[in-house]
Amino acid sequence: LAASEANLAEAKKYMFYQTIGHDKLNQLRHVRFFKDINGMREHMKKHAQILRPKFETVISVLENELGGLGIGSWSKPKGGYFISFDAMEGCAKAIVAKAKEAGLIMTGAGATFPYGKDPKDSNIRIAPSFPTPEELAVAAQIFVLSVKLISVEKLLEK
């Protein structure tokens, strides 16, 4: 704030009473939009109808391509916006990098950990909510190929 000493002193009087807190106007917008808890539940059902097929696409590709191979495991969420994928220890960053080489940009490996530091370098958060179903089908294939390539490299190190 650029002002004279007198104007700064005056502004400080008013700013003194400001608090950091919840955005009350945004809360009011939500209350008016949803009306009540049932309105929110109905709205979230609409979200689920949009997101469910996307999650099913990714889970299906993971199960068909990686199921039973012992090189990864994943969550099957019944809500939320992410699938948690656990690769072999020491592989997550390399998998995300390999996917990026093929044009797939993902959330950074270990993003679910404080400061993004996964001590096992194994966790990858998959967010299937944004891409179209067509893009997601291609992205899931790129991801599983990246998992397979990096896992083979890791196994050959032993």
Question: What is each residue range found by the language model?
Answer:
Residues 104-105:
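Residue-level detector of anion-binding/catalytic polar loops
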Residues 12, 32-44, 63-64, 68, ...:
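Inter-domain helical "communication" segments and dimerization helices
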Residues 1-52:
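Conserved core segment of the aminotransferase class I/II
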Residues 101, 117-158:
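PLP-dependent enzyme catalytic core of the Aspartate aminotransferase-like
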Residues 2, 84-86, 127-129:
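Short hydrophobic/aromatic beta-strand micro-patches
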Residues 5, 88-91, 131-133:
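Helix N-cap motif at beta-to-alpha junctions
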Residues 48-59, 71-86:
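Conserved glycine-rich beta-strand-loop-beta hairpin in the small C-terminal domain of fold type I
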